[in-house]
């Protein structure tokens, strides 16, 4: 620190002036960014002119000079090392990594061959004109300054122009790589010239090779290693977000300075680190947001300081050399750079259009006009001007500095006007009329939701005297995407290219592509949300997001499970290595032909295919290692030269004998094994080596050193035979690694299924077209069914993986909920910060323990399955009674457990395997009339049940025929509980079993409906609190029931059907009853609803419900009012129920996963509502 202050400041007395100057620059820069964002002159130019004005004014006032000197004593090299790392890392970090992968070859062609051609052309032009009368080294440095670009300003210039995602990524990637290569070229030339001046003996070839190895290859590898270490640290370390930020900030600067000290390119290394890191490298949403905001803040501060300091650091005497011809020369350089860059891109455009994602000739104009020059150019010019080495006179350095800075300013001003005009003329804005109409409708929907929320607040008595006219006026926003009349009426109808029929414009290809893009965006958001909630691992979310991003620009294509599988396999080398070992190295014992009929060949066959022969071969290989090691030690090689020579002959004889025996035993089949050919080739090379050694004329043909090198190489190839020994062990290691890949793939499948389920809840908001909506929904349902089927097969083949993943996932969910509860206690003041921090450390320790755990959890047995059924409540008496007549039933693949319309025989608990549930007659059983009118969704008639799930519960409770068929897709093992025995359990054990079964079904259906209809509500602590206060209530058929109470949250119909007494509208289960429904009446004999209420006044609520339950309805099954209590409380209330003739309470359990057909209800969305208490009118 003392050295930095000594270099940064002239003296410690300058510290107040420096702090005041930095604060002033930050304030002025923030003001300019806010108020002059659309000003014709760019903000960087204004900041630079302010710095220049401050430098000029320093000669008129001693007070101003005092502040200017405090900044000017900073070394340009230190200035470069402070601000440049922040800018380059932030720019690389903010890029679209997945699009850069698709455009990799295009960026590589433009950045390396294109840069070289452009650099040579600029150098040729400058040397030909020779206006500045410079030397060759100065021309080389000046050309590097002019060719470079500013990636931060370039990205900012094209961000809001509406360009396509591919073009933006191409421009950003090319600008970043061009600036990095320019800096490497500039630094290499200066280093080479410095060595020439110090009279060191280095050739140009050595400098070029050394520069490529150190600045490019070594920096690239070190960047990859650093990014992997940072990602590993971020995924395993649990701690404070502020500590994460400070440590990452320190690590990045540490990486930069380590690279600079050892001779690598710190800028290139940080660019690689920024590109390899992305949003999925962070553990939580808060941490990600803090880091992004922190780096954005640093980059903006660096932006303000850099351009203001540029004006201050340019010496005032530079302006003394300025003439009008210099300004003209700078304009000439600017126009020449544009022409040469255009010619370069035009020259390589045929190759770019073939190797990349897409490329258009219009892109060339935008790439030329979008190139902004700024910080790297001026920084290199300052480094040259302030260099202590001799690169020219002060006048020559001042000319290079002036022209470099002036060209940058001209580029910033002129390109700001040209670029938007060029985009509009060339028609490259990615903003079509369909997209604008879609965004306009989205904005209108947003306004409607805002106004409806305001309308609901009008009934609040505390806001009765508020000025609602002013409130409504304040929340009414002007639609920025409002279309004019021409845009609204144009292209209302288009003709189908196949049938020449007019169809709705909203159903054209453009609208379909827009819907597909939004679908992919929603999928990515779902995967990232699952990662933040620690449901998905970091590697799994990277694969899912990468696969979705890879389809972002593919027109007419949608992501499916096959594309994810191909994408994940393309990222892994384990599969390739295993195939290589199996096909090339590992020699199987299965010969294609049997032993020969000839005695000699049959004896050879018997000898070769024995364990002893193979082991002797391995022993010979191991023994050959010792002479090989001795031959590599020069002193021992001279002493034992004769012995090594004869030993080599002996081993070669053994190899020849082995090859002859194998050829005699296997005959032509010998040449069908790759390993045999490899061994034979090594043996032939050994024979050739002996021949060359024994012939004396070899000394006259080859150099003796070359002969020695050849011998060593041959001996090394011979030792490679030892690889055959470790090949089986390597296969075992790879197989173990691939078993981990199964767990990884299982996590991907679960994340993909959840993502598709999330998409189904927001399908209405993706598009307003009914046809497109139906197509998207069919596609999502098809993909989800395929994924569930794949998940079932994987779970059947590897049940231990499924149990382990589900267990660890649920542990993470529960620990996250514990964190949410702890935060809620802290906000309410129940617990102090110190106490909360101590408890949080315990939670983090548990999370780390789960993360580090490598144990495999075995699947549940038949006896253990019963202990995990919620409605048995781990009661030994209940379980023992059920086990009396419960039996294990196994079904073969393809067998039907039951068919649609069959009478229920009992409950099937799946122990292992996968069952497909399907409705052959979608209209049978449950009437979907109401929902089909309100929604344009097709009814889902297929589902898959996996291990641990239960089939037939609701049919046994209602004694209704099965409304779906169950077919085994694998061998299925189930625990079957007969229906009669289940009824006996209700009567002999306790009616609570039946009530808890209804409660379990109600929780499952309620959880699913809330997730479907209220997807914007996080599945967190608050939602779990709501589900812990649920009640299952019977709705009578002959009595109207009011729905109104301030303590109610939701009312969900889980079985049967009800009618809205006011609107005469029918709702069939499962359905979320809307707020517009104030009074309902059952229209079926058996109807149940789930009530979710706030935690207050629960006892009063239960009593109120008991009071209004009709006693004369004999056909009503005794209902359930669930509460959060113990089993003893439930038994006590059961006695009260018997006395009062009412219903009893039971313990509420956590909701189990409910499949779409497990409850056999297929109902969709209804408006979001606040629901109330059930009472009898």
From Swiss-Prot:
Region (Transport core domain): 104-191, 325-426
Keyword Manganese among UniProt keywords: no
GO biological process, one term: regulation of intracellular pH
Any one annotated GO CC term: plasma membrane
Disulfide cysteine pairs (residue numbers): none
Stretches for region Ion transport-like: 598-678
Transmembrane found in the keyword field: yes
PROSITE patterns per the UniProt record, alphabetical: CNMP_BINDING_3
Topology feature Cytoplasmic, residues: 38-42, 94-103, 162-164, 237-240, 280-286, 355-360, 427-612, 665-671, 732-1177
Subunit structure: Interacts with soluble adenylyl cyclase (sAC).
Protein name in UniProt: Solute carrier family 9 member C1
Species annotation: Homo sapiens (Human)
Gene encoding the protein: SLC9C1
């Amino acid at each position: 620190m003392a050295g930095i202050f000594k270099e940064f400041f002239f003296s410690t007395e300058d510290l107040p002036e420096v702090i005041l100057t930095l604060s002033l620059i930050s304030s002025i820069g923030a003001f300019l960014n806010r108020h002059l964002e659309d000003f014709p002159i760019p903000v960087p130019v204004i900041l630079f002119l302010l710095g220049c004005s401050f430098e000029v004014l320093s000669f008129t006032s001693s007070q101003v000079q005092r502040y200017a000197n405090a900044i000017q004593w900073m070394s340009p090299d230190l200035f470069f090392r402070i601000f440049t790392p922040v800018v380059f890392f932030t720019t690389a970090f903010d890029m679209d990594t997945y699009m850069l992968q698709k455009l990799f070859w295009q960026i590589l062609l433009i950045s390396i061959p294109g840069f070289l051609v452009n650099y040579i052309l600029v150098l040729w032009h400058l040397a030909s004109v020779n206006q500045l009368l410079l030397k060759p080294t100065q021309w080389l440095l000046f050309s590097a300054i002019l060719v470079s670009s500013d990636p931060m300003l370039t990205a900012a210039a094209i961000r809001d122009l509406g360009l396509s995602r591919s073009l933006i990524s191409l421009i950003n990637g090319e600008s970043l790589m061009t600036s990095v290569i320019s800096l490497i070229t500039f630094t290499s030339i200066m280093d080479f010239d410095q060595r020439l001046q110090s009279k060191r003996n280095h050739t140009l070839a050595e400098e070029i090779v050394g520069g490529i190895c150190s600045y490019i290859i070594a920096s690239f590898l070190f960047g990859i290693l650093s990014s992997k270490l940072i990602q590993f640290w971020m995924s395993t370390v649990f701690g404070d977000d502020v500590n994460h930020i400070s440590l990452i900030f320190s690590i990045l600067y540490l990486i930069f300075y380590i690279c600079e000290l050892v001779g690598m390119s710190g800028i290139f290394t940080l660019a690689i680190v920024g590109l390899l890191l992305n949003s999925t490298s962070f553990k939580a949403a808060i941490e990600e947001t803090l880091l992004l905001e922190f780096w954005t803040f640093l980059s903006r501060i660096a932006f303000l300081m850099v351009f203001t300091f540029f004006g201050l650091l340019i010496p005032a005497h530079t302006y003394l050399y300025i003439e009008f011809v210099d300004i003209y020369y700078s304009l000439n350089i600017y126009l020449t750079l544009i022409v040469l860059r255009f010619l370069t891109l035009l020259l390589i455009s045929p190759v770019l259009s073939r190797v990349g994602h897409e490329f258009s000739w219009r892109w060339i104009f935008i790439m030329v006009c979008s190139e902004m020059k700024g910080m790297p150019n001026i920084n290199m010019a300052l480094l040259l001007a302030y260099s202590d080495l001799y690169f020219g006179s002060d006048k020559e350095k001042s000319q290079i500095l002036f022209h470099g800075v002036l060209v940058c300013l001209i580029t910033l001003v002129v390109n700001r006007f040209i670029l938007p005009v060029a985009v509009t003329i060339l028609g490259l804005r990615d903003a079509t009329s369909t997209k604008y109409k879609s965004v306009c409708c989205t904005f209108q929907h947003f306004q409607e939701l805002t106004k409806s929320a305001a309308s609901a607040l009008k009934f609040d008595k505390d806001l009765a005297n508020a000025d609602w006219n002013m409130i409504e006026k304040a929340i009414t926003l002007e639609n920025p995407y409002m279309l004019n009349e021409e845009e609204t009426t144009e292209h209302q109808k288009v003709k189908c290219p196949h049938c020449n029929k007019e169809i709705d414009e909203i159903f054209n290809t453009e609208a379909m592509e827009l819907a597909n893009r939004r679908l992919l965006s929603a999928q990515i958001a779902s995967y990232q949300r699952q990662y933040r909630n620690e449901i998905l691992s970091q590697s799994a979310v990277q694969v899912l997001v990468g696969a979705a991003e890879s389809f972002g620009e593919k027109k007419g294509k949608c992501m499916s499970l096959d594309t994810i599988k191909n994408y994940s396999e393309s990222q892994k080398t384990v599969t390739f290595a295993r195939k290589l070992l199996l096909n090339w190295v590992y020699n199987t014992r299965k010969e294609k032909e049997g032993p020969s009929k000839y005695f000699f060949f049959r004896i050879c066959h018997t000898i070769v295919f024995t364990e002893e022969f193979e082991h002797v071969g391995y022993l010979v290989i191991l023994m050959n290692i010792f002479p090989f090691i001795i031959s590599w030690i020069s002193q021992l090689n001279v002493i034992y030269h004769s012995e090594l020579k004869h030993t080599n002959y002996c081993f070669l004889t053994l190899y020849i004998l082995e090859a002859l025996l194998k050829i005699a035993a296997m005959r032509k089949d010998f040449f069908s094994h790759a390993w045999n050919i490899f061994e034979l080739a090594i043996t032939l090379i050994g024979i050739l080596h002996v021949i060359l050694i024994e012939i004396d004329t070899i000394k006259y043909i080859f150099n003796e050193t070359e002969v020695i090198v050849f011998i060593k190489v041959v001996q090394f190839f011979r030792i490679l035979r030892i690889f055959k020994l470790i090949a089986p062990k390597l296969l075992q290691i790879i197989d173990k690694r691939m078993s981990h890949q199964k767990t990884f793939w299982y996590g991907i499948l679960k994340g993909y299924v959840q993502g598709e389920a999330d998409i189904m809840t927001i399908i209405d908001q993706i598009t307003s077209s009914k046809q497109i909506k139906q197509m998207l929904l069919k596609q999502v349902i098809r993909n989800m069914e395929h994924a569930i089927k794949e998940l079932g097969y994987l779970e059947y083949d590897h049940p231990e993986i499924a149990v382990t993943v589900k267990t660890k996932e649920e542990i993470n969910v529960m620990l996250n909920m514990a964190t949410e509860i702890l935060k809620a206690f802290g906000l309410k003041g129940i617990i102090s910060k110190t106490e909360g921090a101590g408890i949080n450390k315990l939670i983090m320790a548990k999370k780390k323990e789960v993360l580090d755990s490598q144990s495999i959890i075995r699947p549940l047995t038949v006896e253990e399955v019963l202990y995990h059924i919620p409605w048995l409540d781990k009661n030994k008496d209940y379980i023992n009674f059920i086990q009396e007549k419960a039996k294990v039933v196994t079904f073969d693949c393809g067998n039907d457990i039951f068919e649609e319309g069959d009478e229920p025989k009992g409950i099937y608990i799946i122990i292992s395997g996968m069952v497909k549930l399907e409705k052959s007659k979608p209209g049978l059983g449950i009437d979907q009339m109401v929902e089909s009118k309100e929604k344009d969704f097709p009814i889902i008639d297929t589902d898959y049940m996996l291990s641990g799930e239960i089939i037939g519960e609701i049919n046994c409770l209602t004694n209704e025929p099965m409304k779906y068929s169950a077919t085994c897709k694998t061998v299925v093992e189930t625990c079957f509980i007969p229906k009669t025995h289940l009824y006996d359990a209700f009567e002999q054990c306790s009616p609570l079993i039946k009530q808890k079964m209804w409660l379990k079904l109600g929780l499952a259906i309620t959880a699913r409906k809330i997730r479907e209809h209220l997807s914007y509500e996080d599945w967190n602590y608050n939602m779990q609190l709501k589900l812990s206060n649920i009640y299952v209530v019977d709705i009578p058929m002959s009595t109207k029931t009011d729905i109104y109470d301030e303590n109610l949250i939701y009312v969900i119909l889980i079985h049967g059907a009800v009618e809205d007494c006011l609107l005469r509208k029918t709702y069939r289960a499962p359905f979320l009853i809307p707020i517009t429904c104030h009074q309902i009446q059952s229209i079926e004999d058996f109807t149940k609803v789930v009530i979710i209420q706030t935690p207050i006044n629960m006892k009063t609520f239960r009593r109120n419900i008991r009071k209004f339950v009709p006693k004369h309805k004999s056909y009503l099954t005794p209902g359930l009012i669930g509460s959060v209590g113990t089993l003893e409380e439930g038994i006590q209330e059961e006695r009260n129920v018997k006395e009062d003739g009412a219903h009893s309470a039971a313990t509420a359990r956590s909701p189990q996963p409910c499949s779409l057909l497990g409850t056999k209800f297929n109902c969709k969305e209804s408006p979001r509502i606040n629901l109330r208490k059930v009472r009898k009118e």
